[in-house]
Amino acid sequence: MFSPQIEWDCSQCQSGPTDRRKYCTNCHSMLSWTCTGAGKSGLHTHYYRHRDSCSYCTPELEEERQQKIEEKEVALQQHFQALNDEQRPWSEWKRTDASCIQHTGHDVEQIQELYSMCEEALINYCSHKNYRHTNSAATSYLSPMNLLVVTLWHLKHYHSERYIASELDLSQSAVNYFLSAVVDILHSCVYPELMSFPAGMDNRRILHGPEEHHKLIVGSTFITIPQPDNLDQRKAYYHAKSSTNYTLKVQIACDFRHRIIHVSECYHESVHDITVLRESGLLEHVNDSVQIIADKGCIGEEYVVIPRKKPHGRELTDEDNDFNRDINSARAAIENINQRLKTYAILGGVYRGAVEDFHKVAKSFRSFVLSVI
């Protein structure tokens, strides 16, 4: 059976065959087909495989095909759900909130909420990627839930890939691959859900700082890295207060509910704070009613509020001192967030990944922040 959606031709002699033989009657080359509905084409030998899966060529079979797809998806979800419940480490950690928090930084309910945000992407990854590199037949691959919790475990404690591989009886290459993949999934599925500007920021009833138009707070933190080999890189990454003297800079913004709403890209430590702020896109959202509280490094923008400097040769007035006290008190929110981030091993220690790929480091950092907020 040939569909009216199919056009036949001979690619060698450009003839338009009138019958449906496999080979051209003029030059004996194999005929080619083009499906005008699906926009696909191929040789005669592949036609029937296309026809059996094409809704344009066999619309009468589309309902049956759709039913089979749905049945397969349900069976797959049931399989992964059973695997989620039976496979360690989730089968062990989910027993108590204390165990779950100890390993991932989240309680059971929070883990399940995160999982619901990226369930489809995790299942698709498990379904389409053959990452089953293991050291024994005991564990063939990790379930979607275990991919998530093991990645959160890694982000919280920053265990080495070798250690995770030995704990889960997986190959190190498999651990490396799925950690990178799940960080991407977290970044694409969860980050946009949790990182967003408060609705109606210019509303007076929205929680604000010392003045009603103070709506956001920004502050920079750093990711400690090993000493670079290159002298120019050492100058660019130098930061005297870190354990290695070299860091990457990241800027974080929060609202007055202490909710993180933005994490910037990564920058050399030598890049000025105001440059990071200008490139973050945050300034596109400020106006008379929505202003940002920052530190003294962010001078030069109309709607960015910073502590007042002491005039040359004079002291600050009482009004200036009161203003600075209020601003510094408000900025304590972002400082507390940065301090809380530092209690996690991935920030409290030295970053082990490649620092040259700033975007990849930023994705890892943002995914890590998701495990804290």
Language model regions located:
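The −1 position to Zn-ligating cysteines in a subset of zinc-ribbon hairpins
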Residues: 9, 23, 34, 53
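Short recognition patches in nucleic-acid-associated and regulatory proteins
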Residues: 33-47
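Short helix-to-turn junction characteristic of helix-turn-helix DNA-binding domains
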Residues: 153-154
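Short, well-ordered secondary-structure "scaffold" segments embedded in the functional core
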Residues: 147, 157-373
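Cys/His-coordinated zinc-binding microdomains
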Residues: 14, 28, 36-39, 58-61
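N-terminal positioning helix adjacent to the helix-turn-helix/winged-helix DNA-binding module
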Residues: 114, 145-146
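Short, flexible, mixed-charge glycine/proline-rich loop motifs
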Residues: 1-5, 14-18, 25-30, 45-49
